[in-house]
């Protein structure tokens, strides 16, 4: 202390000597503070520290504006920030004196009174005599001028800042952070954005995320920052239909309720809702470029064209329930699904039909809207419940290549139908000794009719390995030439053995074709029309039956066989034009060929990658679960259910007595003593069979499989019991001449009922419900079982009539149909509108109960 005091005592007389080191130190302090401020992101506004006013400046080193400084930063001494800086040891080495602090001026500070720490420092310096303080002008009494000055500097572009610099000269050093002009401009522009700009920006953004989290984030942003109903009114239909401004305007401008509904349907079809804004943007661009003053027919065509644009396909977005970030996400999905189910876009067509009627949408555009708007459906993969935001394909459903494939294989079914009906008209002329060079006994005639089902049994067994190793298409193609040979053997026969050989070869081909045709169509046709196009083989089969009945009226058995030999020729030619099924290519590891087949079937502009990946996933699951022994796979518990359903449907189909009726139609009418010619009756039955199949083709994708099976069962039960009653009355000697029309009427209703349901649906469902890994072998077993039942019924029908009478045979068939009704009610699933993968997951028991998002039921909907 003594040394320090001595230095201070000498300072009074030698002020200039001590003033020079202090001035030099203050200059260094100024430079270091300036450098430190620049390093921290501040820039110097003004500094005028000189040797003449060091006393004035040292006690006022405070920032001019406190706000640019970070308020939450901890207060640190200059020594702590800059260890090399010792401003208070310039004149005295005072160890117990606190260093000079430097901190922002806070709002709670008293401007007129320096901080306590500075007062202590001043007192220490005064007592030492080393520093003489010069009073400053009084500081401002509040912080408002500083705030006003800061705002004015932003508005006037720096003019106020220059004036502030001039006013600060000679007083203090201050630092401030550069203003972020870009953020202010962004905020101002954000405030000026209109709702339309936000919506267009949302739709036009190129980097739209396919990840559901990104999509939900975008949607939440729109819903949080804009009026929801405004957004929905401009983009799509609101949940509250009458509350939507757009629809309110439509309602006001419409002259009638019918016009309002029409306008609303067009609006929904064109501006359809999509989680991918790119789809909506594409449609907007097309709409803006199209003419608005076209006639009604042109508008309708434009509406359909927009909906069916192949390039507007979007890939599914998989949403795992556990990934939903909040309840609002789930509420959004729930509300969206409620809206969509009310707007008649359910995957269940029966439900859709009821909703169409409720909403007065009818059948004109109902299907188009249902296929244009996305929906949320339940899927399950690897046991984990998921939701799939799925938009059904906007490809044109009836693509000509797909129809060509269905027609090509259906021509094979026409050959099958002709072969099945051949015995009914042919046996009449074959047993006539005047028209045949060889004798055909009744026993041989029964074998002519019964050997074909027996050969079909062998063909069904052999067809399973064929379609697995040769492929579906190649197996079908391989039956064409043997069909021709079989008919030539019959036509050129000189004895019964040649006829039986020809019938056996034809039956073998029939068994293979019956197995492979539904499998091919089930694997190539889209789910939306699989029912309609899947019934084409049955329809063409009935055409073959009708053709055989009509031609048999005018031709003998030999000429009829020559006609049958010409039918496989167009079938053979068309089969060369169509590809193998993509599913079979995938099972053989030929991915590129599968992609080409899908492009051929779905159209060149279609996006086939999602479907191809689904096929590959399904095949991978099948490969993981497959064993070396395919027949042992059939006995697995998970496979027994679909196999037993298929076998049950085949059993009730044949035990309904249909083939007995078809094979022996003429003889039945002769035994009934009908006043109508037997050949005419067969033609009538064939026409009804043909017409009923086309009715089923129209209804099957609207009413569903099970509804048609119910109708079919009831119709067959009633007619078989009535027909049995007629034959019972005839056998007891009662006069039935007044009701000679009854057998034909019963046969017509019976054929109508059979062709609506139990005729085509068992074959269709065989290609739908059997799992992919056992489809070939299981279809082989089901087909063989079907032909076994056919053989038993046709071969034993005459014996049944001899034992229990015609009435007993028909009553037995009716009782079996009655049991079959309960089998359908309790055991057969509905497969309408479902993909093969969905059906397989359900049949294998992989689908678990979902949350309310997936299981929600449609609410009541009122306009």
Swiss-Prot record:
<dbReference type="InterPro" id="IPR005828">
    <property type="entry name" value="MFS_sugar_transport-like"/>
</dbReference>
<feature type="topological domain" description="Extracellular">
    <location>
        <begin position="420"/>
        <end position="446"/>
    </location>
</feature>
<comment type="function">
    <text>Low-capacity facilitative transporter for trehalose. Does not transport maltose, sucrose or lactose. Mediates the bidirectional transfer of trehalose. Responsible for the transport of trehalose synthesized in the fat body and the incorporation of trehalose into other tissues that require a carbon source, thereby regulating trehalose levels in the hemolymph.</text>
</comment>
<keyword id="KW-0472">Membrane</keyword>
<feature type="compositionally biased region" description="Polar residues">
    <location>
        <begin position="177"/>
        <end position="187"/>
    </location>
</feature>
<feature type="transmembrane region" description="Helical; Name=10">
    <location>
        <begin position="747"/>
        <end position="767"/>
    </location>
</feature>
<feature type="region of interest" description="Disordered">
    <location>
        <begin position="332"/>
        <end position="354"/>
    </location>
</feature>
<keyword id="KW-1133">Transmembrane helix</keyword>
<feature type="modified residue" description="Phosphoserine">
    <location>
        <position position="328"/>
    </location>
</feature>
<feature type="transmembrane region" description="Helical; Name=3">
    <location>
        <begin position="480"/>
        <end position="500"/>
    </location>
</feature>
<dbReference type="GO" id="GO:0015574">
    <property type="term" value="F:trehalose transmembrane transporter activity"/>
</dbReference>
<keyword id="KW-0812">Transmembrane</keyword>
<feature type="transmembrane region" description="Helical; Name=1">
    <location>
        <begin position="399"/>
        <end position="419"/>
    </location>
</feature>
<feature type="topological domain" description="Extracellular">
    <location>
        <begin position="501"/>
        <end position="503"/>
    </location>
</feature>
<feature type="transmembrane region" description="Helical; Name=7">
    <location>
        <begin position="643"/>
        <end position="663"/>
    </location>
</feature>
<feature type="transmembrane region" description="Helical; Name=9">
    <location>
        <begin position="707"/>
        <end position="727"/>
    </location>
</feature>
<feature type="topological domain" description="Extracellular">
    <location>
        <begin position="552"/>
        <end position="558"/>
    </location>
</feature>
<dbReference type="InterPro" id="IPR050549">
    <property type="entry name" value="MFS_Trehalose_Transporter"/>
</dbReference>
<feature type="transmembrane region" description="Helical; Name=8">
    <location>
        <begin position="680"/>
        <end position="700"/>
    </location>
</feature>
<feature type="topological domain" description="Cytoplasmic">
    <location>
        <begin position="580"/>
        <end position="642"/>
    </location>
</feature>
<feature type="topological domain" description="Cytoplasmic">
    <location>
        <begin position="829"/>
        <end position="863"/>
    </location>
</feature>
<dbReference type="InterPro" id="IPR003663">
    <property type="entry name" value="Sugar/inositol_transpt"/>
</dbReference>
<feature type="compositionally biased region" description="Basic and acidic residues">
    <location>
        <begin position="28"/>
        <end position="46"/>
    </location>
</feature>
<feature type="topological domain" description="Extracellular">
    <location>
        <begin position="664"/>
        <end position="679"/>
    </location>
</feature>
<feature type="transmembrane region" description="Helical; Name=11">
    <location>
        <begin position="774"/>
        <end position="794"/>
    </location>
</feature>
<dbReference type="InterPro" id="IPR036259">
    <property type="entry name" value="MFS_trans_sf"/>
</dbReference>
<protein>
    <recommendedName>
        <fullName>Facilitated trehalose transporter Tret1</fullName>
    </recommendedName>
</protein>
<feature type="compositionally biased region" description="Polar residues">
    <location>
        <begin position="47"/>
        <end position="59"/>
    </location>
</feature>
<keyword id="KW-0762">Sugar transport</keyword>
<feature type="transmembrane region" description="Helical; Name=6">
    <location>
        <begin position="559"/>
        <end position="579"/>
    </location>
</feature>
<keyword id="KW-0325">Glycoprotein</keyword>
<feature type="transmembrane region" description="Helical; Name=4">
    <location>
        <begin position="504"/>
        <end position="524"/>
    </location>
</feature>
<keyword id="KW-0597">Phosphoprotein</keyword>
<feature type="modified residue" description="Phosphoserine">
    <location>
        <position position="326"/>
    </location>
</feature>
<feature type="topological domain" description="Cytoplasmic">
    <location>
        <begin position="468"/>
        <end position="479"/>
    </location>
</feature>
<feature type="topological domain" description="Cytoplasmic">
    <location>
        <begin position="701"/>
        <end position="706"/>
    </location>
</feature>
<keyword id="KW-1003">Cell membrane</keyword>
<dbReference type="InterPro" id="IPR044775">
    <property type="entry name" value="MFS_ERD6/Tret1-like"/>
</dbReference>
<feature type="topological domain" description="Extracellular">
    <location>
        <begin position="728"/>
        <end position="746"/>
    </location>
</feature>
<feature type="transmembrane region" description="Helical; Name=2">
    <location>
        <begin position="447"/>
        <end position="467"/>
    </location>
</feature>
<keyword id="KW-0813">Transport</keyword>
<feature type="compositionally biased region" description="Polar residues">
    <location>
        <begin position="336"/>
        <end position="347"/>
    </location>
</feature>
């Amino acid at each position: 202390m003594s040394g320090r005091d001595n230095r201070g005592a000498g300072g009074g007389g030698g002020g200039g000597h001590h003033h020079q080191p202090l001035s030099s130190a203050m200059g260094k302090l100024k430079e270091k503070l300036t450098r430190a401020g620049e390093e921290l992101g501040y820039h110097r506004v003004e500094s005028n520290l000189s040797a003449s006013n060091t006393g004035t400046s040292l006690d006022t080193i405070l920032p001019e504006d406190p706000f640019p400084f970070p308020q939450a930063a901890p207060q640190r001494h200059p020594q702590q920030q800059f260890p090399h800086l010792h401003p208070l040891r310039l004149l005295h080495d005072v160890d117990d004196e606190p260093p000079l602090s430097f901190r922002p001026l806070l709002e709670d500070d008293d401007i007129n009174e320096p901080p306590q720490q500075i007062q202590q420092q001043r007192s220490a310096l005064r007592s030492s005599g080393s520093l003489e303080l010069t009073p400053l002008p009084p500081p401002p009494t509040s912080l408002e001028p500083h705030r006003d000055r800061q705002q004015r500097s932003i508005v006037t572009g720096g003019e106020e800042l220059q004036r502030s610099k001039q006013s600060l000269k000679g007083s203090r050093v201050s630092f401030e952070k550069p203003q972020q002009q870009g953020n202010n401009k962004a905020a101002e522009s954000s405030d000026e954005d209109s709702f339309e700009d936000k919506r267009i920006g949302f739709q036009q953004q190129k980097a739209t995320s396919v990840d559901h989290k990104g999509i939900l984030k975008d949607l939440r942003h729109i819903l949080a920052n804009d009026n929801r109903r405004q957004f929905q009114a401009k983009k799509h239909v609101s949940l509250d239909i009458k509350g939507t401004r757009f629809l309110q305007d439509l309602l006001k401008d419409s002259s009638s309720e019918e016009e309002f509904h029409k306008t609303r349907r067009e609006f929904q079809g064109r501006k359809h809702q999509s989680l991918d804004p790119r789809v909506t943007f594409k449609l907007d661009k097309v709409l803006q470029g199209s003419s608005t003053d076209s006639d009604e027919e042109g508008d309708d065509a434009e509406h359909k064209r927009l909906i069916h644009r192949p390039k507007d396909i979007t890939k599914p977005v998989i949403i795992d329930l556990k990934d939903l970030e909040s309840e609002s996400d789930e509420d959004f999905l729930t509300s969206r699904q409620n809206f969509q189910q009310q707007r008649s876009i359910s995957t269940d067509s029966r439900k859709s039909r009821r909703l169409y009627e409720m909403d007065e949408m009818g059948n004109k555009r109902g299907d188009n809207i249902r296929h244009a708007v996305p929906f949320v459906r339940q899927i399950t993969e690897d046991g984990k419940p998921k939701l799939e935001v799925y938009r059904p394909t906007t490809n044109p459903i009836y693509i000509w290549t797909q129809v060509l494939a269905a027609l090509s294989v259906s021509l094979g079914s026409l050959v099958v139908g002709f072969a099945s009906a051949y015995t009914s008209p042919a046996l009449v002329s074959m047993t006539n000794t005047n028209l045949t060079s060889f004798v055909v006994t009744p026993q041989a005639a029964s074998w002519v009719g019964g050997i074909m089902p027996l050969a079909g049994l062998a063909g069904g067994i052999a067809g399973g390995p064929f379609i697995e190793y040769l492929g579906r298409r190649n197996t079908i193609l391989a039956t064409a030439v043997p069909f021709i040979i079989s008919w030539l053997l019959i036509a050129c026969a000189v004895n019964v053995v040649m006829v039986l050989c020809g019938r056996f070869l034809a039956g073998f081909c029939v068994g293979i074709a019956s197995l492979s045709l539904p499998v091919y169509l089930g694997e190539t046709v889209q789910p939306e029309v699989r029912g309609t196009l899947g019934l084409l083989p049955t329809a063409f089969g009935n055409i073959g039956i009708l053709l055989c009945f009509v031609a048999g009226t005018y031709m003998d058995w030999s000429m009829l066989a020559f006609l049958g030999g010409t039918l496989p020729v167009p079938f053979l030619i068309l089969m060369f034009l169509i590809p193998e099924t993509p599913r079979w290519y995938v099972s053989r590891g030929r991915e590129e060929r599968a992609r080409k087949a899908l492009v051929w079937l779905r159209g060149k502009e279609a996006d086939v990658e999602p479907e191809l990946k689904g096929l590959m996933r399904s095949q991978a699951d099948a490969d993981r679960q497959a064993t070396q022994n395919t027949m042992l796979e059939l006995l697995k518990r998970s496979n027994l259910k679909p196999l037993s359903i298929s076998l049950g449907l085949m059993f009730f189909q044949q035990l309904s007595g249909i083939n007995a009726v078809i094979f022996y139609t003429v003889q039945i009418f002769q035994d009934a003593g009908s006043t109508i010619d037997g050949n005419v009756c067969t033609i009538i039955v064939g026409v009804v069979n043909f017409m009923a199949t086309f009715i089923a083709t129209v209804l099957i994708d609207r009413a569903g499989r099970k509804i048609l099976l119910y109708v079919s069962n009831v119709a067959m039960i009633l007619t078989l019991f009535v027909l049995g009653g007629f034959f019972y009355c005839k056998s007891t000697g009662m006069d039935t001449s007044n009701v000679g029309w009854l057998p034909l009427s019963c046969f017509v209703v019976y054929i109508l009922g059979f062709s609506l349901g139990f005729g085509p649906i068992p074959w269709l469902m065989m290609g739908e419900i059997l799992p992919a890994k056992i489809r070939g072998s299981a279809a082989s077993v089901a087909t063989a079982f079907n032909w076994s039942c056919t053989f038993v019924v046709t071969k034993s029908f005459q014996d049944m009539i001899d034992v229990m009478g015609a009435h007993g045979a028909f009553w037995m068939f009716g009782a079996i149909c009655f049991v079959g009704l309960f089998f359908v009610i309790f055991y057969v699933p509905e497969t309408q509108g479902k993909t093969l993968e969905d059906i397989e997951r359900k049949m294998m028991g992989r689908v678990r109960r979902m949350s309310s998002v997936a299981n929600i039921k449609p609410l009541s909907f009122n306009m």
